[in-house]
Amino acid sequence: MSDGFEQKEQKPFNTGREETIMEETKQVGKGILYGLIAIFSAMLLTSLAVSLLLTATSLEESSFNWLITAISFLSLFIGGFISGGKGKERGWMIGALTALSFSLIILLFQYLGFGKTFTAEQLIFHLGFLGVCMLGGIFGVNMRGNRSST
């Protein structure tokens, strides 16, 4: 029995854009997490190696300053590279978010643990970390082999 007012099946206003945004957000978050894990793993291994060298030899800590700085920058480049590779798009942004997350973790550790904020020298280092990690993210996105060309 038809009364003239047939109800049409209403399509939801959402056409799948929210699912796409959620998937992209998961991808970015996953990339940042993998990048941070890589950074902290590399720094942990470096700390272990340097501490073993300091205890086993007569070397002093000051002789490792430049090596530790170079390895720190390399670690952040690798972390940005991994985060950009996992994120698959916008490597500069994912690299920047990875570096900012790293800097925030270090700042929180330093402030909550020691009651100190960043010095001017540390701030310059963390700005350098930001640039290097962004560069790593750009390379990470562009080195992925399974991208399709249009």
Curated annotation (Swiss-Prot):
Q: Which GO terms describe its cellular component?
A: plasma membrane
Q: Can you name the source organism?
A: Bacillus subtilis (strain 168)
Give its localization: Cell membrane
Q: Which domain of life is it from?
A: Bacteria
- List the Pfam families: DUF3792
Chief subcellular site?
A: membrane
What InterPro entries does UniProt report for this protein, alphabetically? DUF3792_TM
Where, by residue number, does the polypeptide cross the bilayer? 32-52, 64-84, 94-114, 123-143
| Mode of membrane association | Multi-pass membrane protein
Name of the molecule in the record: Uncharacterized membrane protein YrzE
Q: Which UniProt keywords apply?
A: Cell membrane, Membrane, Transmembrane, Transmembrane helix
